Curated annotation (Swiss-Prot):
Induction: By Fe(3+) ion deprivation. Keywords: Electron transport, Flavoprotein, FMN, NAD, Oxidoreductase, Transport. This is Ferric reductase A. GO terms for molecular function: ferric-chelate reductase (NADH) activity. The gene is ferA. Reductase activity that acts on Fe(3+)-chelates and NADH as an electron donor and requires the presence of FMN for full activity. May play a role in iron uptake. Monomer. It catalyses: 2 a Fe(II)-siderophore + NAD(+) + H(+) = 2 a Fe(III)-siderophore + NADH.
Amino acid sequence: SRLPPATRDKLADEITFFPA
């Protein structure tokens, strides 16, 4: 999806993104 690289590191991808 549209998640920052640091966030989509090991997350599902559609999970809530946390601003790094």
